[in-house]
């Protein structure tokens, strides 16, 4: 059920009303943000990343501080939105929120590991926010070690917090654009459709065409092909 009645309820209450009618399972809300506000925090950022599973391309993170009184309608975990809806929400978030997007490169993924690279991207996104937040809601079960702002890790946070959901949308849209651009430079892998994830087309192209500079050599399917060569 899509929360179409936001205007009637008012932005801060919209998602809670939708959750109540849908059994409380379908949409993120402002519960975590409001709990942080109750503890005295005023500038709360949601942080999320995308691109941990692909065989190619960077990992991308976004940090978003929402105006809790002026929320875009229909915010949800980016994975639960259609590409068209994500694309429509991106400019709405950018117009109404403070945000930053950052990346960790394929080289950094291979040098460190995908978890550390994901945290690097998160750290960079948070550092780029101006003004800085005073509290962070971070998707996942770990807090990046270089973040020195009070924070909490939120498992499946993009389905629980509207701020994290907004970050997931910006990160997804930004990374998808990168992969579309790379697909034009390196045709045949289907990156414009699979975003670097190991689809059949991508795996077949790795065997037939080979490994590009944008592939993650530390990932087993890529490493295996390089080793065979």
From Swiss-Prot:
It is found in: Cytoplasm. A divalent metal cation binds at residues 48-49, 139. Its main location: cytoplasm. GO terms for biological process: DNA replication, removal of RNA primer; mismatch repair. Transmembrane segments: none annotated. It catalyses: Endonucleolytic cleavage to 5'-phosphomonoester. Residues 42-229 form the RNase H type-2 domain. Its cofactor is Mn(2+); Mg(2+). Manganese or magnesium. Binds 1 divalent metal ion per monomer in the absence of substrate. May bind a second metal ion after substrate binding. Pfam families: RNase_HII. Keywords: Cytoplasm, Endonuclease, Hydrolase, Manganese, Metal-binding, Nuclease. GO terms for molecular function: manganese ion binding; RNA binding; RNA-DNA hybrid ribonuclease activity. Signal peptide: none annotated. Its EC number is 3.1.26.4. GO terms for cellular component: cytoplasm; ribonuclease H2 complex. InterPro entries: RNase_HII (IPR022898), RNase_HII/HIII (IPR001352), RNase_HII/HIII_dom (IPR024567), RNaseH-like_sf (IPR012337), RNaseH_sf (IPR036397). Endonuclease that specifically degrades the RNA of RNA-DNA hybrids. NCBIfam families: PRK00015.1-1 (NF000594), PRK00015.1-3 (NF000595). Belongs to the RNase HII family. This is Ribonuclease HII. It comes from Ruegeria sp. (strain TM1040). The gene is rnhB.
């Amino acid at each position: 059920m899509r929360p179409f009645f936001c205007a009637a309820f008012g932005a801060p209450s919209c998602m809670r009303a939708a959750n109540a009618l849908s059994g409380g399972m379908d949409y993120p809300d402002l519960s975590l943000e409001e709990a942080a506000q109750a503890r005295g925090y005023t500038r709360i950022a949601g942080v999320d990343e995308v691109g941990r599973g692909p065989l190619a391309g960077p990992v991308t993170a976004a940090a978003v501080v929402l105006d809790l009184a002026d929320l875009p309608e229909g915010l949800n975990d980016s994975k639960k939105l259609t590409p068209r809806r994500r694309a429509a929400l991106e400019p709405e978030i950018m117009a109404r929120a403070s945000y930053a997007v950052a990346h960790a490169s394929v080289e950094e993924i291979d040098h460190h590991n995908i978890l550390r690279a994901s945290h690097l991207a998160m750290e960079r996104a948070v550092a780029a926010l101006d003004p800085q937040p005073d509290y962070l809601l971070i998707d996942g079960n770990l807090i990046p070690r270089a973040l020195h702002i009070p924070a909490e890790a939120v498992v499946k946070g993009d389905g629980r917090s509207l701020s994290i959901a907004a970050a997931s949308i910006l990160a997804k849209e930004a990374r998808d654009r990168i992969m579309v651009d790379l697909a034009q430079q390196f045709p045949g892998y289907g990156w414009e459709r699979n975003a670097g994830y190991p689809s059949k087309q991508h795996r077949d192209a790795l065997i037939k065409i080979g490994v590009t500079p944008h592939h993650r050599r530390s990932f087993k399917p890529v490493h295996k092909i390089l080793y065979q060569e």
